[in-house]
Amino acid sequence: MARSVWKGPFVDGYLLKKAEKVRESGRSEVIKMWTRRSTILPQFVGLTFGVYNGSKHIPVSVNEDMVGHKFGEFAPTRTYYGHGADKKAKRK
């Protein structure tokens, strides 16, 4: 079920402060963050965030198409190694 429109998008407060500091400084640094649940806002476009996936920070460069999505959507937490090979085919 989606979030109510009257509540607005959820973003952790400290993330807004960090993004504002980087914008003011003009430096292009990766903003480390642990909040995968935060929504990407239009003011984040052009910034790079290091989204934590449980073991390391994955760099995510925000563009216009990402606005409205959650940060966690762009940093997968599980590694897919593919399905196991068919054991019957190996023996032949």
Curated annotation (Swiss-Prot):
Q: Which GO terms describe its biological process?
A: ribosomal small subunit assembly; translation
SUPFAM superfamilies for this protein: Ribosomal protein S19 (SSF54570)
What's the superkingdom here?
Bacteria
Extract one GO cellular component term from the record.
small ribosomal subunit
Keyword Translocase listed: no
Q: Name one GO molecular function term.
A: structural constituent of ribosome
Annotated keywords: Ribonucleoprotein, Ribosomal protein, RNA-binding, rRNA-binding
Biological function: Protein S19 forms a complex with S13 that binds strongly to the 16S ribosomal RNA.
**Which NCBIfam families does the record cross-reference, listed alphabetically?**
rpsS_bact
Q: Which PANTHER family match?
A: RIBOSOMAL PROTEIN S19P FAMILY MEMBER, SMALL RIBOSOMAL SUBUNIT PROTEIN US19M
In which family does this protein belong, per the annotation? Answer: Belongs to the universal ribosomal protein uS19 family.
- The protein in question is named Small ribosomal subunit protein uS19
Q: Which organism is it from?
A: Allorhizobium ampelinum (strain ATCC BAA-846 / DSM 112012 / S4)
Q: What is the lineage of its organism?
A: Bacteria, Pseudomonadati, Pseudomonadota, Alphaproteobacteria, Hyphomicrobiales
